[in-house]
Amino acid sequence: VRDAYIAQNYNCVYACARDAYCNDLCTKNGARSGLFATFGPHGDACWCIALPNNVPLKVQGKCHRK
């Protein structure tokens, strides 16, 4: 498990503006909890605590939306 920004497809973070949204998103994906990281290196995005290894996370590089 690891603490990280949870990622969507194509290395894109989940943008948000509320801790409740991030906590729900992270726990539904198996994390212990989640929070809204404001003004982070990837903008306002969800940060998960104890995210399982099988869930994608934001890695270095750009978001590549189709």
UniProtKB/Swiss-Prot annotation:
Its main location: secreted. InterPro entries: LCN-type_CS_alpha_beta_dom, Scorpion_toxin-like, Scorpion_toxin-like_sf, Scorpion_toxinL, Scorpion_toxinL/defensin. The keyword Secreted applies. Residues 2-64 form the LCN-type CS-alpha/beta domain. GO terms for biological process: defense response. It comes from the Eukaryota. PROSITE patterns: LCN_CSAB. It is found in: Secreted. It holds the Pfam family Toxin_3. GO terms for molecular function: sodium channel inhibitor activity; toxin activity. GO terms for cellular component: extracellular region. Expressed by the venom gland. Only three disulfide bridges can be formed, because only seven cysteines are present. Disulfide bonds join 12-63, 22-46, 26-48. Keywords: Disulfide bond, Ion channel impairing toxin, Neurotoxin, Secreted, Toxin, Voltage-gated sodium channel impairing toxin. CDD domains: neurotoxins_LC_scorpion (cd23106). Belongs to the long (3 C-C) scorpion toxin superfamily. Binds voltage-independently at site-3 of sodium channels (Nav) and inhibits the inactivation of the activated channels, thereby blocking neuronal transmission. Has the structural arrangement of an alpha-helix connected to antiparallel beta-sheets by disulfide bonds (CS-alpha/beta). This is Toxin Boma6e. It comes from Buthus occitanus mardochei (Moroccan scorpion).
